[in-house]
């Protein structure tokens, strides 16, 4: 039995004594303890070494008091498992090769044996669960098909997604073939994470805002729904969070995927989102990550505002406090600790 199950209760929209909190990229460079581990090895080796991945996954639980851990990994391990070379060079960026630009390139990508290619993630999950000793839940995750597609086709990050959109608009069947291939791997990957012990899954569609509403409906949402429905069919009790960054105009359609919770970017009023969704799903978010550069008073006032905007809880509401995107690497850890402690205290009156 979990000693602290507030995060899972909130995702399932069950009564909670307060609002749970964790933050995206909470195991990361803002922590001196993470940097000490990271100095010994490169980023991908850290992801692939279960003992080290477990250590950094647990750091924010020990140091910050967050209500959930998220397994330390990277969304691009899926691309790598499918046969792409992935280089992640902090401060320089991401390179994937060869970029996927033709039918021949798509055919060359493999549907991997997840245990063989991504077994290190499952080992890290099992080890982390053991070391957490039921203190808090553990989140598993994957990138969404559209986001992984953009990295594959662009060969890295991009400002305007020219190659990805060129394939979408000139060769839509080819684009769907690649998206479908990626999505099938994502589905197997997240199911195996749950089998290994993940208590919840988050699907990150980090580049969702690059698409128009209509294009998102065609090239992104069907694959997210495919992933969510596969999880719900096999593991109906495992909550799923969908984080489609800045897709504020189609919130109800994202909820229609069958997800339990929706991550919200910071440019959406959480009160409006709750009103539109009518407590059909839990809402996760949504403080601007740069607020953590502010004074203690500013951090407290912004957090208080979000809690107040979400408002009083009902028997069917759910809110997980988080940032609207990942914590930035040069944030003072003391500011995150202050935020966590404040949310724990301030949120009680809304429950």
UniProtKB/Swiss-Prot annotation:
It comes from Chlorobium phaeobacteroides (strain DSM 266 / SMG 266 / 2430). Homodimer. One of its GO terms (cellular component) is cytosol. This is Uroporphyrinogen decarboxylase. The lineage of its organism: Bacteria, Pseudomonadati, Chlorobiota, Chlorobiia, Chlorobiales. NCBIfam families: hemE. It is found in: Cytoplasm. Pfam families: URO-D. The record marks 74 as: Transition state stabilizer. It is an enzyme of class 4 (lyase). Belongs to the uroporphyrinogen decarboxylase family. GO terms for molecular function: uroporphyrinogen decarboxylase activity. Catalyzes the decarboxylation of four acetate groups of uroporphyrinogen-III to yield coproporphyrinogen-III. Keywords: Cytoplasm, Decarboxylase, Lyase, Porphyrin biosynthesis. SUPFAM superfamilies: UROD/MetE-like. Signal peptide: none annotated.
């Amino acid at each position: 039995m979990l000693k602290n199950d507030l995060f899972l209760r909130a995702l399932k929209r069950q009564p909670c004594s307060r609002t749970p909190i964790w933050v995206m990229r909470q195991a990361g460079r803002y922590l001196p303890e993470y940097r000490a581990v990271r100095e010994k090895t490169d980023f991908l080796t850290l992801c692939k070494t279960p003992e080290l991945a477990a250590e950094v996954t647990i750091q924010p639980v020990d140091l910050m008091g967050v209500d959930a851990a998220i397994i330390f990994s990277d969304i691009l391990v899926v691309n790598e498992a499918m046969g792409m070379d992935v280089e992640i060079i902090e401060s320089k960026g991401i390179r994937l090769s060869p970029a996927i630009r033709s039918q021949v390139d798509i055919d060359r990508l493999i549907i991997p044996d997840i245990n063989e290619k991504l077994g290190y993630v499952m080992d890290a999950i099992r080890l982390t669960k053991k070391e957490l000793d039921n203190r808090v839940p553990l989140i598993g995750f994957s990138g969404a098909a559209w986001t992984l597609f953009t990295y594959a086709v662009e060969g890295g990050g991009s400002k305007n997604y020219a190659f990805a959109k060129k394939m979408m608009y000139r060769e839509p069947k080819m684009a769907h073939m690649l998206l479908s291939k990626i999505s099938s791997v994502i589905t197997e990957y997240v199911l195996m994470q749950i089998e290994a012990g993940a208590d919840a899954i988050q699907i990150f569609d980090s580049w969702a805002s690059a698409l128009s509403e209509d294009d998102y409906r065609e090239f992104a949402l069907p694959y997210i729904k495919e992933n969510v429905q596969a999880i719900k069919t096999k593991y109906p009790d495992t909550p799923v969070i969908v984080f489609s960054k800045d897709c504020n105009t189609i919130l109800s359609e994202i909820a229609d995927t069958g997800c339990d919770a929706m991550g919200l970017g910071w440019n959406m009023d959480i009160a409006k989102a709750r009103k539109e969704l009518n407590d059909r799903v839990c809402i996760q978010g949504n403080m601007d990550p740069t607020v953590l550069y502010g004074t203690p008073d500013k951090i407290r006032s912004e957090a208080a505002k979000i809690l107040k905007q979400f408002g009083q809880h009902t028997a069917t509401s759910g809110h997980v406090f988080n940032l609207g995107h990942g914590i930035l690497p040069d944030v003072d850890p003391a500011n995150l600790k202050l935020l966590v402690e404040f949310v724990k205290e301030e949120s009680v009156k809304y429950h």
